[in-house]
Amino acid sequence: MPTVNQLIRKPRKPLVKRNKVPAMQACPQKRGVCTRVYTTTPKKPNSALRKVARVRLTNQFEVTSYIPGEGHNLQEHSVVLIRGGRVKDLPGVRYHIIRGVLDTQGVKDRRQRRSKYGAKRPK
């Protein structure tokens, strides 16, 4: 623990809060255009082919965002809406694409947690 004199000489530095989603610029969602749609593999204990898209946002940021749910209709030049939220086992993926909005279709035959995947209520 520092002495009073040490604190006078060199005061305590306030902690800097890092922004986890800088490309959003304090917006809840942002629109963008897919520049590349591809699959990638997760970090060590997990194994899969995760679907991700490189998205060029309206504020000229280029980000990698995750495509949730089973199956998707995205391709290059698809217009998508993204939200913040990282994918723990994909390094560098800090955003999610919102399903059922703009060019992204909702997940087909989804019965539970439908609102998260843009699926309509089944008849």
Swiss-Prot record:
CDD domains: Ribosomal_S12. The keyword RNA-binding applies. The modification 3-methylthioaspartic acid is found at residue 89. Residues 104-123 are annotated as: Disordered. This is Small ribosomal subunit protein uS12. With S4 and S5 plays an important role in translational accuracy. NCBIfam families: rpsL_bact (TIGR00981). Part of the 30S ribosomal subunit. Contacts proteins S8 and S17. May interact with IF1 in the 30S initiation complex. One of its GO terms (cellular component) is small ribosomal subunit. Keywords: Methylation, Ribonucleoprotein, Ribosomal protein, RNA-binding, rRNA-binding, tRNA-binding. Residues 110-123 have a biased composition (Basic residues). GO terms for molecular function: rRNA binding; structural constituent of ribosome; tRNA binding. It comes from Parvibaculum lavamentivorans (strain DS-1 / DSM 13023 / NCIMB 13966). InterPro entries: NA-bd_OB-fold (IPR012340), Ribosomal_uS12 (IPR006032), Ribosomal_uS12_bac (IPR005679). It holds the Pfam family Ribosom_S12_S23. Belongs to the universal ribosomal protein uS12 family. GO terms for biological process: translation. PROSITE patterns: RIBOSOMAL_S12.
